[in-house]
Amino acid sequence: MVLAALIREEIPIPDGVDVTIDGGVTVKGPKWELSRKFNHSEISMAVEDDKVVLEVKFPKKKDKAMIGTVRAHISNMITGVTEGFRYRMKIVYAHFPMSVKVAGDKVVIENFLGERHPRTARFVGDTKVQVKGDEVEITGINKEHVGQTMANIEQATKIKGRDPRVFQDGIYLVSKE
């Protein structure tokens, strides 16, 4: 079996974005900045000619998987500081009119399936949530924080003990932008 002596991944850096590597990766965009530590000693990172270069010499199976993961994280950071991430969710109810509002760092869901106690879902990081009519819009620069906030809202409206084919009430993901 022949092993690769070197795996090299390159991530292009768009204009207006500055990437620095010292112990971690810091990505500065026109408006925002993100930083993250990657504690994978086998992966060497450098910035060369408007590209982030990731290399692993004599990679093992875990190193091959990890270099792809690190590449995806860095490209998500670049996308986050340039464009940001926006997830849209739809409030669906058939039996009881549900009201959703933002209170501090959490979303409060009232009258879900006629329950008297409100359900709550926390924001993660510096994610922003807006409720407009029957739509919930989640925006932020960190894809993981936006996705986890969306998952928290969706889990807060999970129905237990009832047939989900009949009781389709909840807040569901409609689009990712």
Swiss-Prot record:
GO terms for cellular component: cytosolic large ribosomal subunit. This protein binds to the 23S rRNA, and is important in its secondary structure. It is located near the subunit interface in the base of the L7/L12 stalk, and near the tRNA binding site of the peptidyltransferase center. This is Large ribosomal subunit protein uL6. One of its GO terms (biological process) is cytoplasmic translation. The gene is rpl6. Keywords: Ribonucleoprotein, Ribosomal protein, RNA-binding, rRNA-binding. It holds the Pfam family Ribosomal_L6. Part of the 50S ribosomal subunit. One of its GO terms (molecular function) is rRNA binding. HAMAP family: Ribosomal_uL6_A (MF_01365_A). Belongs to the universal ribosomal protein uL6 family.
